[in-house]
Regions:
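Acidic, Mg2+-coordinating catalytic module of metal-dependent nucleases/exonucleases
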Residues: 157-228, 248, 416, 424-499
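Helix-loop elements that line ligand-binding/catalytic pockets
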Residues: 204-213, 217-255, 287, 296, ...
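Conserved DEDDh/DEDDy metal-dependent 3′-5′ exonuclease domain
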Residues: 86-92, 96, 100-104, 115-118, ...
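Metal-dependent nuclease catalytic cores that hydrolyze phosphodiester bonds in DNA/RNA
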Residues: 1-111, 239-275
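Short acidic-glycine loop/turn motifs at beta-strand connectors
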Residues: 108-112, 225, 247, 329-332
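Conserved RNase H-like, two-metal-ion catalytic cores of nucleic-acid enzymes
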Residues: 94, 283-361, 382
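Short His-Asn-centered micro-motif
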Residues: 216, 299-301, 367-370
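Long, highly charged low-complexity segments
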Residues: 250-308
């Protein structure tokens, strides 16, 4: 017999229940089915904690409660602090109607207590009002007179110069009216959640709510019946249209009705999946290749971003380049240049100095996903205007190697709807693989670079640096091989030998 489910709810459980009752039920009854957060998601959680702690400094006289003290202890301590005249309490803890709320910052204002909810986002989003609404419900229900509710978030226009300016780093939005407008629904919402929790696993099919507003960590369980390369893998097809097919009984690509509207690129993908035929537009690819002139550079950046800027001329969540790989092909020979910034200092100026020198011989510079590299270059030109002329010269020579694949001038079913280099490379050059690399994608590279700054052991630092260089080098070597393969496929056999 299944043991009774606890009907006690935390703020995060309440907002989970708003997204999906089944997700809440699984959390309470089958937590072992929950996907563990990957390193990237955990890093974002940690960043949110960092921002929350930093925001407490907006109220320097505040008293902060420790989560490790336990919920019951913190509830009683909160009441004691209020009774003793405390003006600011961080992580103030309340319980009402069997719901727990821990307020990031509770401050005594001129007209009563003020709630401050801190987010590591750079804007106030509608979904955040669900957080403030349930907090207000609990705190007011616990007998506290709440006069105003605020949402504290990062200001993405803040540019660090010298010491952090916390008042400029954070933006404080008054969300009192929005918070109050949702109070009328909370009692009913809680009743519906508790009714769902009291029964067996809710019979709720997958839907857009599996990814909106957040990707659910029970998705691997609920989506286990979805095969590889299903209708959900059709690139650029809107989510609601995918689910209209799914709810109509269509899951496999071959079952898509003939009158269902698809773009030309979507049709190419579906046809390739069904027939196994390779799509190769020789004319378009030849025209693309004709615009590439030797010496040819193959360039890739790695970047990091952080909510709280560490360096001058840096903004919250700005993508900061810390590494590049540049292969140069000229007259049948290939040479390689690379850069990896030293941790603990702003890498951008050193990055630019070496890149401008290394890329000087290139007449064409191939990148994969041109908007990303160009945006980073333009940002560095803005932040370091002394390099602007050289940066403009690089931008003028950039050609996007992604173009033939994004346009579906080349497509095979193993690409599964994607034109990411991680799918294109194995399709064209199956013997070149990231599988044996310690670092296999950009997010891993960013996390490794962040870890590098915290390490003391030289041997471990050396291993990570080597792994970073190997990964970035593989990206640009892969670009070389893709370019080579496209050339060889557009010319008669035996006519061309690049390497």
């Amino acid at each position: 017999m299944r043991r009774p489910t606890s009907l006690f709810l935390s703020k995060s459980q309440f907002t989970r229940g708003l997204q999906c009752h089944k997700s809440l039920w699984l959390l309470k009854n089958r937590p072992e089915l929950r996907a563990e957060p990957d390193a990237g998601l955990q890093a974002r959680f940690d960043a949110g904690t960092e921002v929350g702690i930093l925001a407490q400094q907006l109220f320097p006289a505040g008293v902060a409660l420790e989560y490790s003290s336990g919920i019951s202890k913190n509830i009683s301590t909160t009441q004691e602090l209020i009774a003793s005249g405390a003006q600011t309490i961080c992580e103030a803890t309340f319980r009402h109607d069997n719901v727990l709320a821990m307020v990031d910052i509770l401050h005594k204002g001129p007209d009563g207590w003020e709630l401050y909810e801190v987010k590591s986002s750079t804007e106030t989003k509608d979904i955040f009002i669900n957080d403030t609404a349930i907090q207000y419900y609990v705190v007011a229900g616990a007998g506290i007179s709440v006069s105003r509710v605020f949402l504290v978030h990062l200001n993405n226009q803040y540019i660090r110069m010298g010491e952090l300016d916390l008042k400029a780093l954070f933006t404080i939005d008054d969300v009192t009216a929005l918070t109050l407008s949702r109070q009328v629904d909370i009692t009913q919402q809680l009743a519906e959640m508790r009714q769902a929790l009291a029964g067996s696993e809710p019979s709720i099919d997958i839907g857009t709510y599996c990814n909106d507003p957040y990707e659910c960590d029970f998705k691997p369980y609920c989506w286990q019946h979805i095969p590889e390369c299903s209708i959900f893998d059709i690139a650029n097809l809107r989510s609601n249209r995918k689910f209209s097919l799914y709810y109509g009984g269509v899951l496999q690509l071959e079952d898509i009705p003939s009158d269902f509207s698809l773009s030309d690129n979507m049709k190419i993908q579906v046809e390739a999946e069904l027939t196994g035929r390779e799509v190769f537009n020789t004319q378009n690819i030849r025209a693309f290749l004709a615009a590439i002139t030797e010496p040819v550079g193959f360039l890739d950046f790695e970047t990091f971003m952080e909510p709280v800027p560490s360096f001058d001329r840096q903004r919250p969540y700005q993508q900061v380049p810390f590494q590049y790989s540049l292969h140069i092909y000229e007259k049948g020979k290939l040479r390689h240049h690379e850069f990896l910034g030293e941790t603990g200092r702003d890498p951008r100026q050193d990055f630019l100095e070496k890149l401008l020198e290394d890329s000087q011989p290139c007449r064409t510079i191939l990148v994969y996903n041109q908007p990303f590299e160009i945006a980073r270059l333009q940002e560095m030109a803005r932040d370091f205007p002394g390099f602007a002329e050289g940066i403009d010269s690089i931008i003028a020579r950039i050609v996007d190697l992604m173009e033939p694949f994004r346009n579906r001038d080349y497509y095979v079913k193993t690409m599964c709807g994607s034109y990411s280099i991680k799918y294109v490379l194995p399709a064209l050059v199956p013997d070149l693989s990231y599988d044996n690399l310690a670092i296999a994608d950009g997010e891993m590279a960013m996390l490794a670079y962040a870890r590098l700054a915290k390490l003391q052991e030289d041997e471990e630092k050396k291993k990570i640096k080597t792994a970073l260089l190997e990964y970035c080098r593989m990206d640009t070597l892969g670009m070389v091989k893709i370019w080579q393969k496209l050339i060889s496929m557009t010319q008669p056999k035996g006519q061309l030998s690049l390497f």
